[in-house]
Amino acid sequence: MAPSAQPLPVSVSDEKYANVKWEELAFKFVRTDYMYVAKCNHGESFQEGKILPFADLQLNPCAAVLQYGQGLYEGLKAYRTEDGRILLFRPDQNGLRLQAGADRLYMPYPSVDQFVSAIKQVALANKKWIPPPGKGTLYIRPILFGSGPILGSFPIPETTFTAFACPVGRYHKDNSGLNLKIEDQFRRAFPSGTGGVKSITNYCPVWIPLAEAKKQGFSDILFLDAATGKNIEELFAANVFMLKGNVVSTPTIAGTILPGVTRNCVMELCRDFGYQVEERTIPLVDFLDADEAFCTGTASIVTSIASVTFKDKKTGFKTGEETLAAKLYETLSDIQTGRVEDTKGWTVEIDRQG
């Protein structure tokens, strides 16, 4: 299953940086040097993982991930600070979310300690690919999937946990705010489905409306709930918030919305700032009456929503440096990149060497 190569010890290259034009970084795949692979046979615990040269994985055509879509992924970042430290942001929360998703998809999973260790190893092995401060981040993508062959029967004989990394720039390049299309035909998630976990099956089914929205000039899509078609849920890959007066609202999780790590942090910061924070069902009519709106996620961090368009009617929201979104972005980014003291205990330092 794993690439046919001997495991390599985690070591730091003499090169401080890879040969990359950091100013041109986008949010897309860039091949780096190493990846992590661990396997688990049915009825056993996950083996100790290995750092291997980045390579294609060998996969049985009857693997559960190919036959039935049994797979999950996570996403988190490594940050290089001005004083040369390497930081992760709440990796334990991603490990816990992976476990919740694995339970939902009937899969074994690594412990949180093994998950965090894997992320640290991948970051260190690819340290030269971590952009200079202010130029981007190292995006780390852990994946858990059914790698053993299965055809109409349980249990799966083998599960694989792997992680790779890519240097990335900002997910949304336009700092002026997103222009969203409210999708009124396709639905992202359904009650009692998998919308509350990062199942690999959640994403490509909505590529059609997303591609159409992009062709029409929109930044992204805001989805409505499947049950009524009247309440907002989330973007393609981000949670959504609204501000009305002193009240910050975000849709309640309820199994159809991903419990974002950034979402959780933003709610806590809003309370620190003196706002009333509520998780509730948000009718579209309420959302359209908001003073301000923004989305949150590992990729997007905190990004203002400039407008939403529903059935050709466009509604605008406040954007700019004086918005709550801007304050949240600055505060969260300062913590993540070590520019301010982390009084929350959210960051994990993994390397003290410059």
UniProtKB/Swiss-Prot annotation:
Mostly expressed in phloem. One of its GO terms (molecular function) is methionine-oxo-acid transaminase activity. It comes from the Eukaryota. One of its GO terms (cellular component) is cytosol. Its cofactor is pyridoxal 5'-phosphate. It is found in: Cytoplasm. Induction: Transient induction by wounding. Follows a diurnal rhythm. It is an enzyme of class 2 (transferase). Its main location: cytoplasm. GO terms for biological process: branched-chain amino acid metabolic process; glucosinolate biosynthetic process; response to light stimulus; response to wounding. Keywords: Aminotransferase, Cytoplasm, Pyridoxal phosphate, Transferase. The modification N6-(pyridoxal phosphate)lysine is found at K198. It catalyses: a 2-oxocarboxylate + L-methionine = 4-methylsulfanyl-2-oxobutanoate + an L-alpha-amino acid. Its EC number is 2.6.1.88. SUPFAM superfamilies: D-aminoacid aminotransferase-like PLP-dependent enzymes. Coiled coil: none annotated. Disruption phenotype: Reduced methionine-derived aliphatic glucosinolate accumulation, but increased levels of free methionine and S-methylmethionine. Converts 2-oxo acids to branched-chain amino acids. Shows activity with L-Leu, L-Ile and L-Val as amino donors and alpha-keto-glutarate as an amino acceptor, but no activity for D-isomers of Leu, Ile, Val, Asp, Glu or Ala. Acts on methionine and its derivatives and the corresponding 2-oxo acids. Catalyzes the initial deamination of methionine to 4-methylthio-2-oxobutyrate as well as the transamination of other typical intermediates of the methionine chain elongation pathway. Although all the other members of the family possess a branched-chain amino acid aminotransferase activity, the exact function of BCAT4 remains unclear at present. Belongs to the class-IV pyridoxal-phosphate-dependent aminotransferase family. NCBIfam families: ilvE_II, PRK13357.1. This is Methionine aminotransferase BCAT4. It comes from Arabidopsis thaliana.
